[in-house]
Structure formats: structure tokens, C-alpha cells
A protein has these predicted regions:
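Active-site C-terminal subdomain of aminotransferase-like
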Residues: 1-45, 49
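Short glycine-rich or small-residue beta-strand-to-loop segments that form or flank ligand, phosphate
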Residues: 24, 66-68, 105-110
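Flexible, glycine/charged-enriched surface loops at secondary-structure junctions
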Residues: 27-35, 51-58, 95-96, 132-135
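Short amphipathic beta-strand starts and helix->beta connectors
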Residues: 47-53, 87-92
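Conserved PLP-binding catalytic core of the aspartate aminotransferase-like
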Residues: 53-87
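A common structural junction motif
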Residues: 84-92, 125-131
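PLP-dependent enzyme catalytic core of the Aspartate aminotransferase-like
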Residues: 98, 102-135
């Protein structure tokens, strides 16, 4: 029938989406974009301070939602990600496709604060030398 869904819609998802959109509009889209740009820059700066190399070094092309970092020579990416998760409760994403073992990623989309990223950086300071980082 016209105006009807062909099956029972997921009302919880609809209500969740409605609330999420309200939150975005309350904050203001320009503020949301600015917050993401700020936390992304904070993340990239922290990565550089650790002596790590960003996959995308040109700020004009860097993402404001996720930061990709090259796995340093001699570092076991799986060990890095495993120790971060099990010992520091920090989940890093690996690369995808042909870069699956070459990079790891730090996500900073949504409700991610500077304190959250600072915790990630502190954990990386501890774990990186344990998995072969010589920087």
C-alpha cells in the first residue's frame, strides 16, 4: 500500500536516528565539522610527536575522521594492535586490502575528546617499544 513499508520497520533504529540528527542540529553542523577538524589535528600532531609517519602527510588531503599511520620498520602490527586492545583497552584498526599489514588507524569520528586521544598516545608510548619500535 502507498505510504506503508513492506515489512515491520526497525523503530528503535528510526528513533535513534531521529535523536542523533537532533543532537547534530543542536550542536550546529559547522561546530561538528570544526570539532572533527580539531581532534583530527590533535591526533596527527600526537602521532608526529611519537616519531611515527602518517600515511597522508599533506594536510590538505588528511581525513578528519580517521588517521592512518605507517607501521614502522621492525614493528609487528598485529602485536601492536593486540597489546593496545588487551593491555590498554584501546582498539586500533588495521589497514585494508593491499595495505592490511602496512598501516594502523586511529578513529576520531563522533564523540571523541582530546582526553580520549591523549590516552591513545600514552598507550602507544608504552606499547610501541614493546613491539619493536626504535624511534
Amino acid at each position: 500500500a502507498i505510504g506503508q513499508t513492506p515489512f515491520t520497520p526497525n523503530l528503535s533504529a528510526m528513533y535513534g536516528l531521529s535523536r542523533a540528527l537532533d543532537v547534530l542540529l543542536e550542536e550546529g553542523m559547522e561546530n561538528v565539522f570544526g570539532r572533527h577538524a580539531t581532534i583530527a589535528q590533535f591526533t596527527r600532531d600526537g602521532v608526529r610527536e611519537l616519531g611515527l609517519e602518517l600515511l597522508v602527510s599533506d594536510e590538505a588531503y588528511a581525513s578528519n575522521t580517521v588517521t592512518a599511520i605507517k607501521v614502522p620498520e621492525g614493528v609487528d602490527q598485529k602485536a601492536l594492535m593486540g597489546k593496545m586492545r588487551t593491555e590498554h583497552n584501546v582498539v586500533l584498526a588495521g589497514g585494508q586490502g593491499h595495505m592490511s599489514a602496512d598501516i594502523f588507524r586511529i578513529g576520531h569520528l563522533g564523540a571523541v575528546a582530546k582526553d580520549d586521544i591523549a590516552e591513545v598516545m600514552e598507550a602507544l608510548k608504552i606499547v610501541l617499544p614493546e613491539v619493536g619500535f626504535k624511534g
